[in-house]
Amino acid sequence: MADWELRAASMADLEEIVEIRAVVMRADLERLGRYDEHRVRQRLRDAYQPEHTSAIEVAGALVGCVALRPADDAYWLEHFLLVPELQGKGIGSAVLGRLLERPDREGALTRLNVLRGSAARRLYERHGFVLESEDAVDVYMVRNPTSRTPAPLASTNRVPTNRTPAPRTP
């Protein structure tokens, strides 16, 4: 079991998150022939908005982040990153469930894009996201606030061991 916390992200977190992103996205970007060591980092630096971003911490250490950015017709789920050694342990699902409470309360759509072939797509589908469109690199998904199948969450944070697409950030 791992204890996790969400906290407001800050500019001081940026470079650590940039490095997490480079590790997390490398395999998918290489598979798509799009990995560039500088670009994978710079795209996050250019798009980072700490006011919409939560840092994910386990045992006081920064292990990822997620952003929920309001737009004209929906929220955009962006920059959902979790260090590889903690993936598949329920933390991502619990964090996503917590984050989606806001659009659910507000009756708002949530949109995201994920790289084609990414294992993360299954996580999003389990939380009610469905295909909206796709291109050669990205899959665009949308979630109606009533379509969510809730992930089991403990009362503590304990979990088992406008329609214009958001700017791409590979």
Indicate where each model-derived feature is located.
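Conserved acetyl-CoA-binding loop-helix of GNAT-fold acetyltransferases
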Residues: 82, 88-101, 121-126
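Conserved active-site tyrosine of GNAT-family acetyltransferases
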Residues: 44, 124, 129
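A short helix-loop-beta-strand connector motif used in the catalytic cores of GNAT acetyltransferases and
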Residues: 45-55, 64
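A short beta-loop-alpha structural element at the N-terminal edge
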Residues: 4-19
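Conserved beta-strand in the GNAT
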Residues: 61-69, 76-81
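Conserved beta-strand-loop-alpha-helix junction that forms the acyl-donor binding cleft
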Residues: 87, 111-121, 137-144
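Conserved GNAT acetyl-CoA-binding A-motif
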Residues: 74, 103-115
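Conserved GNAT-fold acetyl-CoA-binding loop/helix
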Residues: 22-43
